[in-house]
C-alpha cells in the first residue's frame, strides 16, 4: 500500500495544479494540452513501461546522460565512491515513477472536468464580497472540486495497488503489491485460488465504497451550492 499511496499523493500534488492552471487558459491551449496529456495513453501500457526500463537501466539513457554531464564523476568525488552508474532500476523509486507516469492522466482528467464546469458567478460573487484570489480558491474552488479529487484518487490508487506489471518490470519483483499477491495465488507457486478470489473481492468492495463516498460527497456539494 505504501508505494500506491506515495504514487497517488504525487499524482494529486502534480495533477491538481495542472488541472487548475489549464482551466484558466484559453480553449485552444486547453485542447492542445489535453491532447498532449492523453497522447501517452494511446500507447500500449506494457510498451510505456518498457520505455522506462530502457531509460532507467544501468546502461540506459539517463545514466548515459549523467555520465556525459559528469554528474556521476562529481558524485564520486564528493562522496569518495567509485560508482559507474546510478542504480535506478529495480528500486521503489522506479516503481513509483512508473505508477505516476501511467496513472497521472487519471488524476488530471476528473479534476479538470469538475473545475472547468464550476459556476463562474460563484467566483465573481466571492470577489465582489472582498475575497482575494487565495480566499476564492480556498473557500470556493477547492471545496467544489473535491468530488473530482476523490474520483482521481480512486482512479489512481486502485490500479496502483493492484498492478503487477510495473512492480515486476521496474521493481524487479522485489516490491510486492496486491496485484502480485493475487497473481501468485492463481499462477505462482503458492497456488491458492480461494485466497486470490478473496483478495480480489476485497479490492472490489474498496472500489464500491469509494464510489459510494464520491456520490454522497457530490450530492452534498450540490446541495451546498444550491443553498
Where are these regions (language model features)?
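Membrane-interfacial helix termini and adjacent extracytoplasmic/periplasmic loops
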Residues: 49-100, 134, 170-174
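C-terminal transmembrane helix and the adjacent membrane-cytosol boundary/short C-terminal tail
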Residues: 112-123, 127, 197-227
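Membrane-helix interface segments
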Residues: 25-33, 91, 121, 133, ...
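Hydrophobic alpha-helical transmembrane segments of multipass integral membrane proteins
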Residues: 2-14, 18, 43, 138, ...
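Periplasmic/extracellular loop-to-transmembrane helix junction in inner-membrane transport proteins
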Residues: 1-9, 25, 84, 184-191
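Transmembrane alpha-helices
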Residues: 39, 101, 106-121, 127, ...
Amino acid at each position: 500500500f505504501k508505494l500506491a499511496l506515495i504514487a497517488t499523493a504525487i499524482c494529486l500534488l502534480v495533477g491538481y495544479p495542472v488541472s487548475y492552471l489549464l482551466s484558466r487558459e484559453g480553449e485552444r491551449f486547453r485542447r492542445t494540452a489535453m491532447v498532449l496529456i492523453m497522447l501517452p495513453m494511446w500507447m500500449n501500457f506494457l510498451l510505456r513501461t518498457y520505455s522506462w526500463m530502457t531509460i532507467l537501466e544501468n546502461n540506459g539513457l539517463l545514466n548515459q546522460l549523467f555520465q556525459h554531464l559528469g554528474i556521476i564523476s562529481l558524485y564520486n568525488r564528493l562522496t569518495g565512491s567509485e560508482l559507474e552508474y546510478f542504480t535506478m532500476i529495480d528500486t521503489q523509486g522506479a516503481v513509483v515513477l512508473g505508477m505516476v507516469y501511467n496513472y497521472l492522466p487519471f488524476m488530471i482528467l476528473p479534476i479538470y472536468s469538475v473545475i472547468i464546469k464550476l459556476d463562474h458567478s460563484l467566483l465573481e460573487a466571492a470577489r465582489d464580497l472582498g475575497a482575494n484570489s487565495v480566499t476564492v480558491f480556498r473557500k470556493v474552488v477547492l471545496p467544489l472540486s473535491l468530488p473530482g479529487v476523490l474520483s482521481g484518487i480512486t482512479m489512481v490508487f486502485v490500479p496502483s495497488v493492484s498492478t503487477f506489471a510495473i512492480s515486476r518490470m521496474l521493481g524487479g519483483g522485489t516490491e510486492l503489491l496486491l496485484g502480485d499477491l493475487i497473481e501468485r495465488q492463481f499462477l505462482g507457486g503458492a497456488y491458492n485460488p480461494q485466497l486470490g478470489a478473496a483478495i480480489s473481492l476485497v479490492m472490489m468492495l474498496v472500489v464500491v465504497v469509494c464510489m459510494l463516498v464520491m456520490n454522497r460527497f457530490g450530492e452534498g456539494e450540490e446541495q451546498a451550492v444550491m443553498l
